[in-house]
Amino acid sequence: MKKNIALMALTGVLTLASCGQNGNTPTADTTAPTVSLSVNNANLPSGVGSVVLSGTVNEASTVVVKNNAGTTVCTVEVAASGTFTCPATTIAGNTSTTSTSTSYTATATDAAKNVGTSSVVTVNVAGVSNPAPTTAVLTIDLAGVSSAPITIKDANGNVVQGYDNVTVNDNATITVARGVYTVTAGNVSGFNGPTTNFRVDLSGGNQTVTLNYTQAGTTTPTPVGSINILTPAVGTSVTGGSTVRVTFDKANEVQCMVGGAAAVTAQVDSTSGYCDVVVPNSTGNVVITVMGKGVNGQTVTATRNISVTQAAVSYGVVTPAGDQELTLTSEGIVRDADSGWRRLGQGVSTPSDPNLNLDIYIKGTVNFSVNAPAGQKVELFLARTTGSDVPTNDDIQAGDVLRSVASTSGTETFSLDSRRLAEFDGVRKWIVVRINGTQVTYQPVIADNKGPQQPDPELNGVQNAYSNILNNYNNSGLTYVRGPVNVFTSNPSLQDREFGQAPVGSSFVQRRPAGFESIRYYLVPESAFNNKALQESDEMLRAKAVKSVATVVSAPVLEPGTVKATSFSRVIGSGATSTVAPKALDNVTYRVYAISRDQVGNETASATYDLVRFDNVGPTITGSVIRDTSDLPFPSQEPERCLSDIATISLGGIADNVGGVGLNPGQGLTFTLGGRQIQAGQFDTNQLADPEYTIGFNSLTDALGNPVVTAPTNAKVYIDNTDPTVNFNRAVMQGTYASGGRVSVESDASDGGCGVYETRLFWDTANGVVDDATTTPAIGHPVQFARQRVTDGAKADSLNAGWNALQLPNGAGAVYLRSLVVDRAGNATISTTSIVVNAKITNQARPLLGGFDAFKRNASAQFVGDDNVIAGVNGTAATPNVTGNSALDNILSLDSVGTLTTNAYLPRGATETAITEKIRNVGAYGRFDATQWNLIRDYQLNTDPTLRSAYVNAGNLANQRGNNWRIRTPWVELGSSDTANTQQKFDFNSDLLNDFYYGRTFGNNHSVNLFSYDQFNGVVSDTAGAYSFYGETVRK
């Protein structure tokens, strides 16, 4: 083995030697690889972070990345020219306030062991930021004492804990949360301390507050900090009563005062400030004091002495009374006054000084005052000039003497009646003041006691859909207006009077009245037309009269506007849709006046006026249009809403509101029902189906266009030609009952139209009989035993009742239970079910009847009869009053004694104990008038228009009625007594009127035909179910 290895080694050496000997020795690789390095994030925040280092190399190499501490970050073998990436490298967080850095370098070593090095890559880590301070230090600087109590409060007035009147030493430091605080110094014995609170703002950091204490009885030393007065200079001379501006350098909360006057708050900016103070009206030196707060909140003051001199007095100044000045109101017009004054320039003042050359305009009597030295003679004149603006001595001497007096108080007063020189109205005159015969002053005045030119009021419409105007409607002289109306004057050039040539000798060539100011419109109601002052020929007096009685007043109009044809226009509102104020009332005739006004309040009323009447209410449809007038089978409970069969159309009427303009000429009133135009007269409602209908009418207006404001009384109607339905739930058809027993009866009624009105239950022993005779021994008529009305118009009704079964002695057979239902439209239905009633064993005899009678009110009864008789037994038959409550009360009086019967039925061959039966019930009844019942029955079976209607199955309806309506006239229950006894007397009062009709209530004044009963009947029954009856006819 060893030999072979040695041989192989020798062979290799020989081979190499052989190659070298051929002259082809290879060149050695000495070129280092090129490598670069980069980092994905060179700047990291202070917290822990990470970076990714990557780079490129141009040949196959081993790449090693290290940090500046020599620690290897990663080693990567790159097979060929390409890129490399190190895994993410964690960077430790920086806890210092300065930033730190870490540098990285990559080396690449190729196969020939050549090494290339990249440039250095640095990663910076930011330092930790210092947190914003939240506290500040307040230093207490005590001047004059070594310690003192203090109180510290925050901005909300809350005491800082531990510092409520707590003693601290000089230069004490107190750490508190940043903010605004107030420091109050406490008392120190023997020392005078600060008397004000100190505001300290610690929001921006530490502050010091200085608290100055001085020994009692010593002068307070000059505080730290100062304020300097810049102007006025020391010793400046100013006039007493004048205003002086004081300027100073920077301070806070500065106030200025002069002597002992009230302080004035100064205006302060960032570098300086000022305040304006009024110096006293006296002579001598005064002190101006300026005080404020320094930068640390301490009080700082400065003073300045100035000299005050007496202002020169100008005597002879004429001043009008302040309470007579004619000022402007909130509407921009001069206030009302009979006398007064106002300063006006009238074009002679200048823009540079608008108060120059102002005249005092006066009207009425004006009070003046003039200042003059005491003890001097004061003469007052009213002068006119003769060509120059200032009166000459001759003008003065020729003037009117207003007053001549020796001045005592220094101020003299006088009055001037501006109407004394009427021919000089609008011309400048002069109040001349002459003092001691030598000093002369002048005050020009202009009297103006006349109003402007008369306006002429006119009316026109406003451009909106609602407004309308009818001038001189139907030659009535009235203008009718709907909605707002525009009031104006056609004269845009109204001038004040007197305007024109001045009298000879005046200082003005032209008169100069105060000038036109405004127009206002006044509406005087018809209730004031007889006011005599409205006929005043003086237009100014007439203006006062108009204002005293007008009820609608427009706002003043100061400008004529842009449309010359409608100058000085103003809108007067009316009606609910108008939002314009003021508003006129409907159906009131007004006179429209215009009043013009000048600059001193003189007013002129228009010589003419317009008559206007406002109407914003449309016509009214009166009464009902259609009404049910068919009483068959029964009247409608709501004849103006619920219609059946025949209705009567009256079409109502239409009228404009009282005082309105009237109906639009040529318009007629038409109505429609179900799309059909309807005419006055009878109307068969069977032409229409049964739903609800709205009565339509054409678009009517009055002459101004106001639409109808009310619909017909019955704007909606319900056509109901369908009979109600009814069926029995109990008793069971063909059920068998013993007489005297209780039969439970229940019927259900419904109506899909106007609703159920009432249900009545009857028992009957005859069926299919229509002769209306009363048979014996059975009654043979339907006899009512229960009734129920529905008052709320319900669509369904259920009636539960009990009936004590009745049967003749030894009788057995069918009894017919009948339910009669009437709906609110007057339609009716009868339903019948039959049961079998057998006489009870003890039902062997009928109750015995006592005497009975029907007699007039306050008459005596004549009891007659003791059997089943129906006749006028004693000739006292009553005649009913069918137009209202009857004056004849029918009193039914009877005395019935039940029989003591013996039970003859012996089913077991033995004699049983006799059973005594008692009277159970005595009932009073009125028989439905036979003639009227025959009409109803014939109507239901033959003549009802509904039987020919296209909206019902006429054949089925006829068959149904044919089966149910073939019955005799029913007996209507009037009252009963239900106490079991061996005998019973029963009295009952009746008004004779059939309650199928009488007592029906309607929401209108229409009456319903009333019908009386044609018989009064009584039925007496016992506990065994046997019965007797009696009756008395009623005279027709």
From Swiss-Prot:
One of its GO terms (cellular component) is S-layer. Disulfide bonds join C74-C86, C256-C275, C642-C754. Its main location: secreted. Gene3D superfamilies: Immunoglobulins. InterPro entries: Ig-like_fold. It comes from the Bacteria. Keywords: Cell wall, Cell wall biogenesis/degradation, Disulfide bond, Glycoprotein, Lipoprotein, S-layer, Secreted, Signal. GO terms for biological process: cell wall organization. Residues 1-17 form the signal peptide. It is found in: Secreted, Cell wall, S-layer. The keyword Cell wall biogenesis/degradation applies. Glycosylated; contains six glycans. Acylated in the N-terminal region. PROSITE patterns: PROKAR_LIPOPROTEIN (PS51257). Shape maintenance, possible protection from noxious enzymes or exogenous and unsettling DNA, and may mediate homotypic cell-cell contacts. The hydrophilic C-terminal region rich in aromatic amino acids could be engaged in interactions with nucleic acids, and the bound fatty acids and the N-terminal region could serve to anchor the layer to the outer membrane of D.radiodurans. The HPI layer contains about 30% beta structure and virtually no alpha helix. This is Hexagonally packed intermediate-layer surface protein. It comes from Deinococcus radiodurans.
